[in-house]
Amino acid sequence: MWALVISFLIFGCGRAESNQPPVPDGGSAAEDTESSSGANKRVVMFLGTSLTDGYGLEREDAYPARIQEKIDSAGLPWEVVNAGLSGEKSAAALQRVRTWLIRQPFDVLVVETGANDMLTGANVDTMRANVQAIIDTVKAGRPQARIILVGMMAAPNLGQRYVEQFNGAFPELARQNELTFIPFLLEGVAGQAPLNLADGIHPNEDGHRVIAGHVWRTLEPVLRERGSASAAAP
């Protein structure tokens, strides 16, 4: 239990926050935009915290890059963009969506946010409203895009009431907005020493492989479905 509690205590740490836009895995933003359009690739973007950013690892070892490997192995015409940002709370994520992300090309958006709100004991209703606003912004600005919501779990030492409110916010948001839902990003990784860095806190390369595996189980059918729909379109 305490290992799980500790695993939440560092989500807000990692690379310094940057105002630079994320670069697609595998090259510069300009190069990847060019190659994507040339090859008729579609974009799946990962909006997230240090868990998506890949704290303590090279970007190619973070789970979004592992997802790209799975996409390539499956021969699917999709490109991953890792838009993770360490230390980001849901309000800042919303601001990024409104000012930058909504202007980027993407067909599927994976949303992972809220962990850093939880670390500071931020009001759950406020966090939930921010996530809802992210969903609303994407639906209004990119109505054809598919949103996948990633759930998070609160540290038990925050108290039963807070834990219940926080943990319940994500499945409820997914249900109310009819979104594809991944219940817990760190399933099978949180608190497992062999899957975390030497500090016993952050997922290591093996941990990110596990994360990529269970994210892929949800993401793959979405990409195949949307790829088929695109191919069938006149």
Q: Model-derived features: where do they sit?
A:
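Bacterial signal peptide processing site
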Residues: 13-17
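Sec-dependent bacterial lipoprotein signal peptides
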Residues: 1-11
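Short, flexible loop segments at the rims of nucleotide/cofactor-binding pockets, characterized by
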Residues: 85-89, 158-160
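Conserved Rossmann-like nucleotide-binding pocket used by diverse enzymes
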Residues: 9, 79-81, 148
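Short polybasic/polar patches that bind polyanions
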Residues: 9, 72, 175
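Alpha-helical cap/lid subdomain in secreted, periplasmic
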Residues: 94-234
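Serine-esterase "nucleophile elbow" of acetyl-processing enzymes
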Residues: 20-86, 96-105
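Active-site micro-motifs of SAM-dependent methyltransferase domains
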Residues: 52-53, 73, 87, 117, ...
